[in-house]
Regions:
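Short alpha-helix of the ABC ATPase nucleotide-binding domain corresponding to the H-loop/switch region
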Residues: 57-64
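Hydrophobic residue in the Walker B motif beta-strand
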Residues: 46-48
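ABC-family P-loop ATPase nucleotide-binding domains
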Residues: 1-42
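Conserved catalytic loops of ABC-family nucleotide-binding domains
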Residues: 66-80, 88-90
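The feature captures the ABC ATPase H-loop/switch
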Residues: 83-87, 101
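Conserved catalytic segment of ABC-fold P-loop ATPases
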Residues: 89-98
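Walker B catalytic motif
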Residues: 50-51, 58
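Conserved beta-strand-loop-alpha-helix hinge in the C-terminal portion
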Residues: 99, 103-126
């Protein structure tokens, strides 16, 4: 039941549960499968690296809903690495860090995400 509910939340066809993991999956289906694993395994810490990369707007919304469900139900910690702040808009963000060339050059709270949305990354890349 839990698997079925999570697959429904992620807009995944139930037949995917019978398939080999990621075999014949599109890029978006693989991303959803990653979030499905997150919801099923409930790790204390998850690192999501470019989870929104290559996803269309609808898929980003769906994946965000899955991540939000993890935040609400599992109470685990997330490290989300992204170049696009879109996926962060509907999530609870405790801290934000900007990394350039391997160094963290700015730390902030959720308001830093809003600042980046308004002015972009250009000011950080010039350092």
């Amino acid at each position: 039941k839990e698997l079925e509910r999570a697959m429904e939340l992620l807009d995944m066809d139930p037949s995917y549960a019978e398939r080999d993991l990621n075999v014949g999956f599109s890029g978006g289906e693989k991303k959803k499968a990653e979030i499905l694993q997150l919801l099923m395994l409930k790790p204390a810490l998850a690192i999501l690296d470019e989870t929104d990369s290559g996803l269309d707007v609808d898929a980003v919304r769906t994946v965000s809903a899955g991540i939000r469900k993890y935040q609400e139900d599992c109470k685990g910690s997330l490290l989300i690495i992204t170049h696009s702040t879109k996926i962060l808009e509907s999530l609870h963000v405790d801290a934000t860090h900007v990394m350039v060339e391997g160094s963290i050059i700015k730390n902030g709270d959720a308001s830093l995400v809003e600042e980046i949305n308004e002015s972009g990354f250009a000011e950080y890349e010039q350092r």
